């Protein structure tokens, strides 16, 4: 196999790996967003006798959470706004759809890269047979 073809295949493999990593990251984000939607949508939090609140670095404190009042939501650049639980759920559902759309775009890119890899590989294999 020619060096330039091998380099091209290695490059395509690295792109596929990068896309796979991005898909994995987005899948994890999607799970987190869905969990938050579920938490805000059902009454389990209110009926739970013990609530643990993350205070960072893997530490938790017992506390009370009231989600019937406005939630404090970051909107960027250190700015926060108050938002109703219902509005937060709507926003999170939109975020979830955006994540799904991004995953689909990445899956399409991955398919294109795999097709490109297979084409380069098959072309080189055909050349070597002759």
Curated annotation (Swiss-Prot):
Cell compartment(s), UniProt: Cytoplasm
GO biological process: protein folding
Source taxon at top rank: Archaea
Keyword Chaperone: yes
Gene Ontology MF terms in the entry: unfolded protein binding
Keyword Ubl conjugation: no
Coiled coil: none
Complex and partners: Heterohexamer of two alpha and four beta subunits.
UniProt cross-references to HAMAP family, sorted A to Z: PfdA
Source organism: Thermoplasma acidophilum (strain ATCC 25905 / DSM 1728 / JCM 9062 / NBRC 15155 / AMRC-C165)
Primary localisation category: cytoplasm
Pfam family, any one: Prefoldin
InterPro entries, alphabetized: PFD_alpha_archaea, Prefoldin, Prefoldin_subunit_alpha
Similarity field: Belongs to the prefoldin subunit alpha family.
Keywords: Chaperone, Cytoplasm
Protein name (record): Prefoldin subunit alpha
Function: Molecular chaperone capable of stabilizing a range of proteins. Seems to fulfill an ATP-independent, HSP70-like function in archaeal de novo protein folding.
GO CC terms, sorted: cytoplasm; prefoldin complex
SUPFAM superfamilies the UniProt entry points to: Prefoldin
């Amino acid at each position: 196999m020619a060096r330039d073809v091998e380099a091209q295949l290695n490059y395509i493999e690295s792109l596929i790996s990068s896309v796979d990593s991005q898909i994995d990251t987005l899948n994890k984000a999607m799970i987190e967003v869905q969990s938050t939607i579920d938490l805000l949508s059902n009454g389990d939090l209110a009926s739970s006798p013990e609530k643990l609140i993350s205070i960072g670095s893997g530490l938790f404190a017992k506390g009370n959470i009231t989600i019937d009042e406005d939630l404090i939501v970051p909107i960027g650049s250190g700015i926060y706004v108050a938002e109703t639980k219902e509005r937060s759920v709507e926003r999170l559902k939109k975020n979830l759809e955006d994540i799904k759309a991004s995953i689909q775009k990445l899956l399409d890119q991955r398919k294109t890269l795999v097709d490109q890899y297979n084409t380069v590989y098959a072309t080189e294999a055909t050349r070597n047979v002759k």
